[in-house]
Swiss-Prot record:
Cofactor(s) recorded in Swiss-Prot or TrEMBL: [4Fe-4S] cluster
Name of the protein described by the UniProt record: Phosphomethylpyrimidine synthase
Gene behind this protein: thiC
Cofactor remark from the record: Binds 1 [4Fe-4S] cluster per subunit. The cluster is coordinated with 3 cysteines and an exchangeable S-adenosyl-L-methionine.
Residues noted as binding Zn(2+) in the record, renumbered to the chain: H437, H501
Annotated metabolic or biological route of this protein: Cofactor biosynthesis; thiamine diphosphate biosynthesis
Described purpose of this protein according to its UniProt entry: Catalyzes the synthesis of the hydroxymethylpyrimidine phosphate (HMP-P) moiety of thiamine from aminoimidazole ribotide (AIR) in a radical S-adenosyl-L-methionine (SAM)-dependent reaction.
Residue positions binding substrate: N239, M268, Y297, H333, S353, R354, G355, D394, G395, L396, R397, E433, Y460
Domain of life: Bacteria
Any Pfam family the entry gives: ThiC_Rad_SAM
InterPro entries according to UniProt: ThiC, ThiC-associated_dom, ThiC/Bza_core_dom, ThiC/BzaA/B
Amino acid sequence: MSATKLTRREQRAQAQHFIDTLEGSAFPNSKRIYITGTQPGVRVPMREIQLSPTLIGGSKEQPQYEENEAIPVYDTSGPYGDPQIAINVQQGLAKLRQPWIDARGDTEELTVRSSDYTKARLADDGLDELRFSGVLTPKRAKAGRRVTQLHYARKGIITPEMEFIAIRENMGRERIRSEVLRHQHPGMSFGARLPENITAEFVRDEVAAGRAIIPANINHPESEPMIIGRNFLVKVNANIGNSAVTSSIEEEVEKLVWSTRWGADTVMDLSTGRYIHETREWILRNSPVPIGTVPIYQALEKVNGIAEDLTWEAFRDTLLEQAEQGVDYFTIHAGVLLRYVPMTAKRLTGIVSRGGSIMAKWCLSHHQENFLYQHFREICEICAAYDVSLSLGDGLRPGSIQDANDEAQFAELHTLGELTKIAWEYDVQVMIEGPGHVPMQMIRRNMTEELEHCHEAPFYTLGPLTTDIAPGYDHFTSGIGAAMIGWFGCAMLCYVTPKEHLGLPNKEDVKQGLITYKIAAHAADLAKGHPGAQIRDNAMSKARFEFRWEDQFNLALDPFTARAYHDETLPQESGKVAHFCSMCGPKFCSMKISQEVRDYAAAQTIEVGMADMSENFRARGGEIYLRKEEA
């Protein structure tokens, strides 16, 4: 039976209550730890899962235990994961990166906003109740300067952001001593470079080569540095955003916090409804992770939703507006060229990308080349002044497996490769967006084409969905493809929720999508052989074999669901120490039987060993002390 559907008023009230009562909190039996770096202010948060000891012998009255090491894990929740930090959504998060940005001395505060739209919004008194109170004074690069992480990397500069990332990517695995936990199967990396220890210099080198990006707008100092690249942990993006028919500012902030709690490495705000500007300000000021947008959505709202009325001037104003708010990466559909649009005519599902369809309609109605392509160098100049990364959109991605890997898809991909080189001329960081709907046997070609034609820039894919028959379960159909393409080298996976193709996701849908994609990303890290990726799996397996139920729950990606499923049939506290679960019961538990076999074998080994020693003793004549030459 599904839960009672809340009214719009109830949904908003629930979200407001969530925000008003929000506190920093850790997962069960976890604690927040920080690992410090060598540069000022580099203090990297991680979550450490505390484990119970293993019973190794003794008696019922005097049992003997062996301690189990705590397991450090990557944590995207920012201050929301630290019970010691007071959270106030009205004030926003602390500006972690502000001292680093200021110390570089290459930015200046703006006395006047560059965007006419922003000026108009700020002058509108009617928006005061909606507006975030502590609006940041935006910065931009000083004249003649570039402030991107790519620029610094190419200059040989290791920024605090790079050191922060190096520590974060190592996940504290140097703290683990147990050989059982450190054991790892060799991976198949398909050419990825996966060093045993990630250093700040390695991070710098990968960024300088364009193989990785650090989305870090100078106007989003609240964000904790992270990296997207195939030689690092596979990342996951969550999409949130209102629409013309549903959701509010409160609900979107709630979804942001919820997303970071469940492992979103970045969040895209895809709002298309009212108060886009104000919603985004609330999100940015409260986000510990990079925020991406699709600027064409808001530009379209500014021309009343009429694609033909879009202009470069309106789009440019939108870029400036969002860059000065702090958006970390823009999805730009600059590869949808006029000559590619006819290639989609024979497709089963045509053009399914919103941004792609908007630009295709504009091109056809004006019979002109895509203005994003025509003005791409100007786009790069704007991005270089704020360190906004470019996510080059796949506007011609396939919307069904029948259309996978067709002429239009790869023609656009090749153009994205050309645009990548242009962006790099301006020291602008770039990643490439990918499909979509692709059956399993056709997935790897997407990765090889991208690496070859886009010069190893990071790949960022939506799934891909491997079958089209499962509306309501597309987090599964796409999670399969996501795990595969992540293994092949995809750097970031855009989650798909159960509501894909059906409606706007709610809070629970966001969680389901993220858990599915964290599984896919982790499976890809294991398959690639990412150093340390197997530690948590080994800890879980050890806890499972030793019937440490609480540790099993706490090591899970979703401890609450794991515990709830167990407690449906064994709710008593005794069930948390039982050497069986309800699947097999006490007599047929394979792990319990395995333990008994192991104990029996160990006892037999001791008994046989003692018999051998006894026989040897008798053969030597039964003397307690042997002559020196006989010893």
